Amino acid sequence: MTEDNNKAAGAKPRPARQVRTGLTSTGARKASAKSNRSRAREFALQALYQHLVGRNDPTEIDHFTRDLAGFHKADAAHYDALLHGSIEGAEQLDALIRPLLDRKFEEISPIEHAVMWIGVYEFQHCLDVPWRVVLNECIELAKEFGGTDGHKYVNAVLNGLAPQLRAAEVEADRASGKARA
C-alpha cells in the first residue's frame, strides 16, 4: 500500500522508528549493552547492599546472588573480588572514603556506600581497569540503583580519591587533557 492508500483506507501512519542507542529511557545502559564486568559490578552491588543493610553472612549472600537470573553472564571472578575484597577490606575502604564525606556514613545511602566501596576497591586492586572506567562504571551504578543525585556524590568522592590511589594514571590523563586538572 502506498501512503495515499493508507490514508484512504483509514490506516494510521506508522510511528518513526526509535534509534537504538543501547540506553534505556532513564539513560542507563540496556542489559544487552552491558559487559560481563559491568554485570559483575551490578551483582556485587546487590550483594554488598545485603551485607550493609541486612548484615547477612557473606557466604550466604554469595550463594544467593549466584542463583539470581543473569548471573551466568557476569564475570564471576570480578564479582568474587569485588564482593569478598570489599567486605574483607571494609574498614580500610571506609578509612579512605571518610575524609571526603560531608556527613556520617550512617547518613549515606547503602547503595552509594556500596558503590564507593566498589570504586575504591577497583582503584586499589584492579589496575587493569583504567581509573576513568572505574569512575564511570560507579557513576552508572549509582544512577541506576541509587537515589536521584546519589551519582553526583559518588562522583565527587571517587574523583577525589582517584589522584591519591591512581596518581600516575590520573596525572598522565590530566597532562594529555583527558581529565580535568
From Swiss-Prot:
- Where does the record place the region Disordered? 1-36
Against InterPro entries, the record matches this protein to:
NusB-like_sf, NusB_fam, NusB_RsmB_TIM44
GO biological process assignments: DNA-templated transcription termination; transcription antitermination
Q: Which GO terms describe its molecular function?
A: RNA binding
Please give the Gene3D superfamilies that the UniProt record associates with this protein. Answer: NusB-like (1.10.940.10)
Q: Which GO terms describe its cellular component?
A: cytosol
Q: Which keywords describe this protein according to UniProt? A: RNA-binding, Transcription, Transcription antitermination, Transcription regulation
The cross-references to SUPFAM superfamilies, in alphabetical order and at most eight, read: NusB-like
Top-level taxon of the source organism: Bacteria
What protein family does this chain belong to? Belongs to the NusB family.
Which PANTHER family is this protein grouped with?
A: ANTITERMINATION NUSB DOMAIN-CONTAINING PROTEIN (PTHR11078:SF3), N UTILIZATION SUBSTANCE PROTEIN B-RELATED (PTHR11078)
Q: What does this protein do?
A: Involved in transcription antitermination. Required for transcription of ribosomal RNA (rRNA) genes. Binds specifically to the boxA antiterminator sequence of the ribosomal RNA (rrn) operons.
Specify the protein name.
Transcription antitermination protein NusB
Q: Which organism is it from?
A: Variovorax paradoxus (strain S110)
Gene symbol here is: nusB
